[in-house]
Amino acid sequence: MSFNFADTPIPIRTEIQEAMRKEWAFLAAPGTWWSGEERVQIAAEARRAMAGERSGDELPAAVAGVVRTVAANSPLVSAEWVEGLAAKGVDMPAYAEIIGVLARLSAVDMFHRALGLPLEPLPDPEPGKPSRTPPPTNLVFGKSFVPMAIMVSIPQTVSLVPPETVAWQELSDAMYMTLGEMGNPDFRQALHRTQMELVAARTSQINECFY
């Protein structure tokens, strides 16, 4: 079974294991704009980029370039860069789905690295075509590079593709806290809320992740 964490130095909460298994199933399934095979290939390309390895040949070169830039060279991402993606065959909704896949992959992989564990093998893709469901119409440009819902929630950055928002929120609920728990300044799991936020803020600073 995936994500059993049998060799971890500390016990891993059951809800984290279940959330990661659910994420792997979602990654392998056809998405809104990318097939299951393409989604797994996107994840594999991101891992190669993070490891400093050469690009694979599964994805079109332009798509692989987008994945590698976001995964391993994010300072190059700008509003102008995102606006230019359509000319490379990657429109805004398709880009938002890539962001969703990579954001959750990063969370899972960094969790393993922090525990000194090998990365979980990527899932086998499921057959089927992407749904091509049109994006919502009530989205706006704010400080983001893609249109999004007007909500104070990081997963809403991919609200062009609602299933990606749902998947991101579910993983965040297990690995961090739920939206309801965020309203409690005295929330505690293994760490108190203030300790959790200190770790989160320091990690964001080191990674130059500002929002």
Q: What do these predicted ranges mean?
A:
Residues 1-211:
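Hydrophobic alpha-helical segments
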